[in-house]
Amino acid sequence: MCDEDETTALVCDNGSGLVKAGFAGDDAPRAVFPSIVGRPRHQGVMVGMGQKDSYVGDEAQSKRGILTLKYPIEHGIITNWDDMEKIWHHTFYNELRVAPEEHPTLLTEAPLNPKANREKMTQIMFETFNVPAMYVAIQAVLSLYASGRTTGIVLDSGDGVTHNVPIYEGYALPHAIMRLDLAGRDLTDYLMKILTERGYSFVTTAEREIVRDIKEKLCYVALDFENEMATAASSSSLEKSYELPDGQVITIGNERFRCPETLFQPSFIGMESAGIHETTYNSIMKCDIDIRKDLYANNVMSGGTTMYPGIADRMQKEITALAPSTMKIKIIAPPERKYSVWIGGSILASLSTFQQMWITKQEYDEAGPSIVHRKCF
């Protein structure tokens, strides 16, 4: 491991649901914690308890019963900068235990991130944390690097947003990027709703976290939704039980695949959007005819919401149905795809050829925050 080397770069992937942070050159992030800031709902009565006015990450998660939880990143885009600063502070000082002023820092951003946001990230890094150098990379591009490719189309689906990003020779093609505001958090909400129909009530932000756990442990994508519904109706072979924190055991049946089916049929939650298979196809069709073949053959999945068992087979089936019949279609779903953005960042930041790409403190002082548009693309 490489903490001793004072110039090791830091890699911080700020997701809507989880922050993944660690050192460039490592093969996995050192710290993975929820992107949440919690504030007490009640006035503290225990004097001398050292109660804080805010909690971040796992600590907020463990005290969730008495806190109001807020996510500063919505749909992949930072919306609350004060809370975001708290999260970064927690990342550097409590999780990684490093002094940010000693390490170049690679941050990630959502595709089509507003320009003002990139500038604000740059400004906070240099002015609040005094980093010596920094870089902002697009999440989907890093996932592609992590799979060992420079051309392909990435389906990146996390907690807050889903994107289809076609990439050719390392460059994202912005005109063909598709954004779908439907991701893990919406699936959790939908599961809360359909479990309520079974008579189980989940309402608070704390209970939502329980449902998220049920979703991650028990949900899967059906290859054929109608068939699966019929099977679920006629037998109990698909039923699974889950023990709640208070010891009560609940049973869940067709909810297991009805929940992630929303990715393919957003109308389940009242959205008019196309499903992820259609957005992938539409994104490919917006690209130059000459590169489509390469994109069809390199469909890379990344992000936690692509972790459902069965999703790759279903995707293969759906895209095959949409694409020209002779087209070779390949879905790449690496087992570590939950962290592939971070892994790609770790690879990128440790390449010798990348070292001249960093925005240095000196360049920032000369040009100001807008330097990020010139150096990071």
Swiss-Prot record:
Region (Interaction with alpha-actinin): 112-125, 360-372
Name of this protein: Actin, alpha skeletal muscle
Entry GO CC: actin cytoskeleton; actin filament; blood microparticle; cell body; cytosol; extracellular exosome; extracellular space; filopodium
Phenotype upon changing residue 328 to N: In CMYO2A; no effect on actin structure; higher sensitivity to calcium
Any one of the GO BP annotations: positive regulation of gene expression
Location within or outside the cell: Cytoplasm, Cytoskeleton
Associated clinical condition: Congenital myopathy 2A, typical, autosomal dominant: A muscular disorder characterized by generalized muscle weakness, delayed motor milestones, hypotonia, and muscle fiber abnormalities on histologic examination. Histologic findings include abnormal thread- or rod-like structures (nemaline rods), intranuclear rods, clumped filaments, cores, or fiber-type disproportion. The spectrum of clinical phenotypes ranges from severe neonatal presentations to onset of a milder disorder in childhood. Congenital myopathy 2B, severe infantile, autosomal recessive: An autosomal recessive skeletal muscle disorder characterized by severe hypotonia with lack of spontaneous movements and respiratory insufficiency, usually leading to death in infancy or early childhood. Longer survival has been reported.
